[in-house]
């Protein structure tokens, strides 16, 4: 009997450490790698035109197997006591699910949240989860098994008692899981730890006695490299960090270094070693295997802003390799943003602007060909539509600093973009996706036409074109809308010749505001922007049928 027990123990050891190499996850799922699609349904309802079916087709063509969709449900509901989820939110989720199902990709519906450095998890989060998740499960329970739920992204209470906060979250998560199971008993559900989804807090989770769980953690180690210069962290003063560690390449500590800066800088050689980066992965594999569960890392990445491009690619090559060796499902953060798969955040044409070395390092395909530009398509069709009935075509649309919807409809009218509770200088962008030469249109007498409706006499709105940030500085040519329509709550048509737009200056995060200097360039236009003035605006405005007319 003793021999049989020893033999069984040896077989289990080999399962965790095959050929005495890296331990491997025993429970496998039919997907292994994917990408996050943030911003679309995060933090604001004004980004719903940022992606479309073509983007999902592009993502699939890379070899992506699973898409994680962060949904900030706290802004996509009608508030206490029922926290009723917005119909528009469900429409967006169902579109994403339809596209993923058609394309053969898995979809993670992630209950996302505010994760800025100074944020903390909503103290009422349990009530919200217990109301929202049954609604989501009821709506999605008949979808295919390719749809996966994630209880919540990066919970982080700030009581000062970390161990207590982690235990508190574990209990809340268990209750949310019960609420989901009451409606959708068999669905795959992702669970994670209560300290920003850290690996250590995942290891502290109780056994929820559920066979359809995926245990999850996030991995941005070594933090000094991945988040160097990030303005939302305590590392905003530290840049030029090498990876791997090199004493000769290390920058000096900033003057009057904080305790956080000094700790990260001093420990970087050890923190960036392969031993320190891989040992936690082995612990996670052992933990998941004991639970008989799959294991996922559904956020990892490096900000492209300050990291050396080659060293950044090398980090991804190593991280992906280490996770693949252990059969850990990996879902990178993100797609088009600062941690994304493109060479920059300002130019995201597919496939021209993809970071080919990065894709190769991550085991993805590098597509050939050229994207269809909005301008070329408009010239071919003869219709320079920018926004029509909620559709932006090949353009990306997004906004900030206001409430509203990009697909608002009332009484059966065509869809419009609706904005209210508008903060000073808030803006709504139509991004052309590449620098467009509109100089011939300007010389030919082209004009911007649209319909607008507002009853707000305090509205101070302007419209401007912005030229490309790939130049030294992004300049603006603007036209004020003050006095061009009546604040009577009725739809009115506006027509503004390009010749009425004047060089007013420009702004960049690096240089701040500069007054106009006659440098605006009509040959490299990258966006059209509606912007509020210096005063807040309560009632706001609606706009529709935006186009360039010749």
Task: Go through the PLM ranges and name each one.
Residues 40-47, 223-226, 396-397, 505-506, ...:
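Short, solvent-exposed loop/turn elements at domain surfaces
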Residues 7-16:
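Bacterial N-terminal signal peptides
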Residues 36-38, 68-72, 108-112, 150-152, ...:
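A cross-family glycoside hydrolase active-site/sugar-binding cleft signature
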Residues 372-550:
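Beta-rich carbohydrate-recognition modules and glycan-binding surfaces
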Residues 305-381:
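Aromatic-rich peripheral "rim/lid" segments of glycoside hydrolase catalytic domains that contact
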Residues 130-273, 278, 282-302, 325-326:
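Active-site region of glycoside hydrolase catalytic domains
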Residues 1-4:
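Positively charged n-region of N-terminal signal peptides that target proteins for export
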Residues 25-188, 193-202, 212, 339:
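Active-site mouth of glycoside hydrolases
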